[in-house]
Amino acid sequence: MSLVSEEIVQEILLSIAVTAHSEGGLLRPTLRSISAAISELARDGVSCELLIVLDNATAETSAEAEQWLAPGRVTASVRIVRSAAGDASASRNLATHYARGLYLAFCDGDDLVTSNYLQQAMLMLLEAQEPLIIHPSEVVSFGARSAIWKIPASESIDHRNLVRHNLWPSSSVSQRSTYESWPYSQLAPEGGFGPEDWLWNIETAIAGIPHRPAPETMFFYRVREFGGVNNRHVHSILPWFDLDGLIDALPLHSDPEPMTIQPTAPRSRRILRRGYRIVRPVARMVTAPLGQARREKIYSWVTRVSRPVNPAGLVSPRVEAVLREAAEIEPALSWTAYSYANLEHWNHSDDGYAALLVEIVANLKGHTEALVMVPWVGIGGADLVSINYAKALVEDERFHGNVSMLATYIPSRTIRHLVPTGVNFVQVPEKFRELSPDQQRRLMAQVLLLLKPEVIVSVNCFDLTNSLQFFGRQLGSASRIFLTLFAFDRIGAGYPVNPITDDSQRAFLTEIVAILTDNTVTAGIVQEMLALSDEKVRVHHQPALDPIPSLSIGTRAYNNRHFTPTNPFLLIWPHRLDKEKRPDTLIRIAEKLRSEGMPVEIHVYGQQVLSDDGESLMRSISAAGIKYRGPYQGGLMALPTHDFHALLLTSESEGLPLVLVQSMLLGLPVISSAVGGVTDIVHDNQTGLLTKGPDDIEGFTSAIRHLMDSLDDRRRIIRDAYDFAIAQHGWTSFSRLVDELT
């Protein structure tokens, strides 16, 4: 008795497509396993055809495929389809185009199936009233890695599972119309997107098509040490997909008690075949009033895939028979089969990745035509730069209302009121740091690919730089990306470090539009060091105050002429108390001034952010007679600068510190070490006074004495510095530069 009714037995019911390219002799065991599965269907009266799709196939692979054209090799018609697409999606879509069966199955050219796989799939599909996708119930990996992967039904998972893991293997069986209506998206291998079957699984799940495992079937997945799909997709990532649609299709739910899928016994199959014409209409009549959603819930209960694992050393006779059958076809399976009872079971687990992804995307969605990425938004110079870019972008009519700032690091360091009005601020939850570094990089990249901002400006956001190292091609294809590099931090004996240069390959530099810096000195260093063209490094002089105040001539700096111990010359040092700012130099300056009897008092504002020697540093500051005034917010404008006579900067490494620009606009002369981009704005004895570097204690002392002794020079420097800062660091010129980012 046939599995199918007589009226459809004359036409091809099932096409089986095997896709191959460079498998060579490994194609043999695949086709032998497919041939065995076809023979099982032939005994049930199911007419089949075998399509071997050769995509840019090697000569050895092509020769192996052609051997299967010989009559009697397979109990089905055999055709070879050739293509030069070099793409798995195109191969599968080509198979769909040429397939003649009402149903279609796919298998890659180096994997194996059990002889009952196609039979069990057809039993389920012939009973289906609507589109349905069948997979094997268990995937056994062999080769470079051995493991067992139980395949879930779509009714037993939610969107978080499918966002985090590709839950269904590339091998599937469905109505041919399913593959015609939802073809595989073509993802060029060089683009870095994929795997294509994961995207197809997502898209079909969004369409509401159930994915279900065929009971008691196995699929043997060959894992290669080198090459192969599994290695090619190590650094692949999913392209854009409809996340909202997936959430709607696979909502969160509480799972009922898991149940084992009951196998279809041979006797049951005989009964099914014999009563096929009766059983199908009865089954449909009984379940039809329940509706599709209810029928799927019932199926979910029955076909739950969380099954008890066999005790160590115990394998059922049925499984042993299946493994033995497969090993006779492919002996490379033997050691995996021998260890089957003790193999690691891969299970999709919830590590928080998907929940974080959904939360971040939801908070950013609708506000990401332009995106500024930062570690945090605080009071430092880089923080002001990030605020400048966010403000300029949100004021641009092309982006108004669609600009976000995404802070990825320590939330407590962000001062929310500093975020410009109209800018959507999103903080990455601290749980992000509980993910592995690999998953952090992937999640950040996936968020950006789902949102596809037109412009991304990263201001020292190391999380984006880390993602670019692995997903630069993909991110660069979706957005115009700009990174900032203002200066190098120093480690050890002064070795330069920066997230951009820490990556020894730096392949991502070809994928970004440009590196932004705020001074010509750093621009020149970066161009030479990284072998970048002029177009790849852009100098953006940053606004420091908005609005710009008129020059104040009522300050102590502009008017005080004589200084005594009771009326000292007051210096302000408003920086982070971290190593690169060289607070140790400040202590040495204070000791030098005291030893020479100069009536000078130094006031420190700021706090430690990156260093951890706070207590000992504060003791040394106090011992040197320096007055510590505590941390501050709101930039230099928040401090009583009119009470001071000059500002000190002692750093060993800087870009162009905006605190110097602010000081000039507020009428406070600057004494600074000549490092980094400082010389772009501080011209010695014109717009300020320079020392040779942070260790030039004598130079600092002489500069302080010069400003104390000459009120005329002090006033001249104040006026010239103010005019220079307005000309170089105005808001209008900066806005024009930001316009060029788009």
Model-derived regions, located:
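Non-catalytic membrane-proximal stalk/linker segments that position and tether the catalytic domains
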Residues: 1-10, 240-244, 251-369
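Short hydrophobic beta-strand element within catalytic cores of glycosyltransferases
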Residues: 669-672, 682
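Aromatic "clamp/platform" in nucleotide-sugar-dependent glycosyltransferases that forms part
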Residues: 652
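Acidic donor-binding loop at a coil-to-helix junction in glycosyltransferase catalytic cores
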Residues: 191-200
